Amino acid sequence: MGVSVKRIVVTGMGIVSPLGCGVQHVWQSLLAGKSGITRLSEQLVADIPCKVAGQVPSIDSDPLHGFDPLATIPAKERKKMDRFIEFALVAAREALTQAGWTPASAAEQERTATVIATGIGGFSEIANAVHTTDERGPRRLSPFTIPSFLANLAAGHVSIAHGFRGPIGAPVTACAAGAQAIGDAARMIRSGEADIALCGGAEAAIHRVSLAGFAAARALSSAYSDQPESASRPFDRD
């Protein structure tokens, strides 16, 4: 006898990326061969070998497809979270809109899982907290300091924002984190823990410390600073 495997389908997607926001726009940009790698400010990387990164464009630099957190997140709430959480909230809204999923009943809410991964979490907020503590003293820290950078709070904020009460997860497995989140979500559905799962990954780790650390590990491109679009060369023999 064959083993019956529960079928799982993707019904909605959302994205915040260096190519901009919105699945359709980003997909068309990829098909056109566009690169999202750009040069970083000299102030940030003056003494760091790598001068380029995949920076998410702001709504000011790209009025059509730039990142606009205020369209999704109240200004007061933004003060309580790192940028990676903002990315998750904006991408999640697009995915849920595309899927048409707005659980209203308690049963639907309890059967909706949230699994959002990150490799590092709120790196910038951690660094800011260290700076504040060193320069101004520990009493100057906000009560929201810890929640602002915890790796699991991307999933936490998304589930709270949409009223999900099902299983929650936050894989922290470096570069494999986003892929693991998708796998974990699929297993939750297949095992019967959930009927619906919102899953993915979010990262916002462009900071002098992270750039310097990865550069020290020789994990960043340093040969194409004047040609950012050529910096990502995964199959280049040199």
Specify the residue positions occupied by each region the protein language model found.
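Acyl-thioester C-C bond-transforming condensing/cleaving domain
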Residues: 2-5, 21, 32-42, 78, ...
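Generic anion/oxyanion-binding catalytic loop in active/binding sites
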Residues: 15, 81, 171
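Generic hydrophobic secondary-structure packing signal
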Residues: 25, 29, 84-91, 177, ...
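A glycine- and small-residue-enriched flexible loop/hinge segment at structural boundaries
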Residues: 43-101, 151-165
